[in-house]
Each structure stands twice: as C-alpha cells, then as structure tokens.
C-alpha cells in the first residue's frame, strides 16, 4: 500500500510553459513537473532564490497528472516598443527604454489553455526531506499566492488536497473525483450554467518512472525537460514521461 497526495488544478486560464524560442511562448497541454512543484513551493512559502529548499522539494516527490479536461488554446498577441541595441548603453528600467530617441516594435505571442482541468498526484521518493503531510498542510493554507503557470491565471477551485492510500497510482486517481465532478457539485444550484468545463472523450494520464500500474500501461514514453537542476540559472534536466489514455465513462 502506497500513500499519494492528490489535488485539483482548475482555472479559467492556465499556461504550462513549453520550450520557448524567440517571440513564441507555447503552453503544454498538461501541467509539467516543474510547474506542479513550483506551485507546491509557493504554497510552502519557498522563494525562487532559496535553492536549497527548492532542491529538497525536488528530491522529495514524484509527480503524476490526470488531465480531466484539456481545454482550448487561446493565443494572445503582444506588441512592445523597445529601443535598438547599442553597445555600452544599458537600460535599467522600462522608463529608461521608452526615453530612447528611437523605438522599434516587436511582436510576440503567448498561448494559454482555457477551461482546462487537471488532478496532480504526488508520491514520496525514498527518504524524502519533505513529507507529503507537510505539503498537504501547505496546500490547505498556502503562504504565497498560487497561480496556474502565469500570474494572470488564478485558481477557480480550491486545491482540495487529500492523502489517499492505494495499491497503485491508478487506484489512487480512481478514488479522487475529477475537477468536473467537483465543479458540478458546486454549481448544482445554478443548473443554467452547468459545470462550464468542456470534457474530452478520454481521460489522459502522465507519470514518471517507477509508477506503473496494472490498469495503466504506457501507450507512449517520451523525454521531458522539466526536472529542476538549478533554479537560479533556469537549468532543467531531462526525464522520461509515460502517457496513457482511457475512454471516459461518465
């Protein structure tokens, strides 16, 4: 019997950063390992410069995701005025940039997911510096603001952290309601609006090595660069992520 910590992630907009090159800032369909643990770090009051505490959290948990609803892509376009690059000229503030005699315009775009819902499952590694109970307590009373990838993406449901004992990861997920089920119960008094979350035909699962389950055999395995190496330098290592899709029964 293993212990898992499960909690909801749902909001009108989410953004789970993918590899970004140039002006394009894409989003993964589901929360990444670094995003999930970054959210936990905020709940525990761990600041970005506290490298030792971040590494302790990294060594403590394995992360799995159940994608309850993938949502839809929303692409946001930006135009920004910037000064031309000049040697020996440094702009320390945005005000300094705008005072330049000549300004150029750059275009950028950022992807979001609207009405996406996911369930995170954490399991403890061997001899974890931080326990699942400590994380659950922090998710119940977060010390820093929690957002879903970007500061413009607040939560729309309580995290609802819950420790579950189960034989394997799939059984732990089965014991925890989907975000849509929770939202449906909250909106029963407003039948006109319903749950508001468009569901797909499949429930999708993503997990790390050593977390296979009899009812959840990998259909795909691919590398994912989202395992923290050094937060100050924004360096991440590669890990293997497994994928399994199940036809939705509800």
Tell me what each language-model feature is.
Residues 9-15:
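Short polar catalytic/cofactor-binding loops
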Residues 3, 18-88:
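Glycine/small-residue-rich interface belts in oligomeric ring/scaffold proteins
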């Amino acid at each position: 019997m293993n212990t898992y910590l499960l909690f909801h992630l749902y909001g009108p907009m989410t953004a789970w950063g993918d590899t970004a090159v140039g002006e394009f800032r894409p989003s993964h369909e589901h929360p990444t390992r670094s995003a999930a643990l970054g959210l936990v770090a905020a709940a525990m009051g761990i600041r970005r410069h506290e490298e030792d505490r971040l590494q302790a959290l990294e060594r403590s948990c394995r992360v799995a995701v159940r994608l309850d609803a993938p949502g839809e892509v929303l692409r946001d376009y930006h135009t920004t005025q910037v000064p031309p690059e000049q040697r020996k000229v440094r702009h320390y503030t945005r005000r300094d940039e705008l005072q330049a005699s000549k300004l150029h315009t750059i275009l950028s775009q950022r992807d979001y997911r609207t009405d996406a819902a996911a369930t995170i499952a954490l399991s403890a590694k061997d001899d974890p510096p931080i326990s699942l109970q400590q994380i659950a307590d922090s998710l119940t009373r977060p010390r820093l603001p929690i957002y879903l990838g970007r500061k413009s993406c607040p939560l729309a449901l309580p995290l609802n952290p819950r420790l579950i004992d189960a034989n394997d990861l799939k059984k732990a997920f089965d014991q925890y309601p989907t975000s849509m089920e929770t939202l449906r119960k909250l909106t029963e008094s407003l039948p006109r609006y319903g749950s508001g979350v468009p569901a797909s035909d499949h429930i999708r699962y993503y997990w790390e090595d050593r977390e296979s389950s009899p009812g959840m055999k990998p259909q795909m395995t691919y590398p994912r660069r989202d395992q923290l190496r050094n937060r100050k330098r924004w360096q991440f290592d590669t890990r293997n992520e497994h994928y399994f899709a199940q036809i939705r029964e509800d």
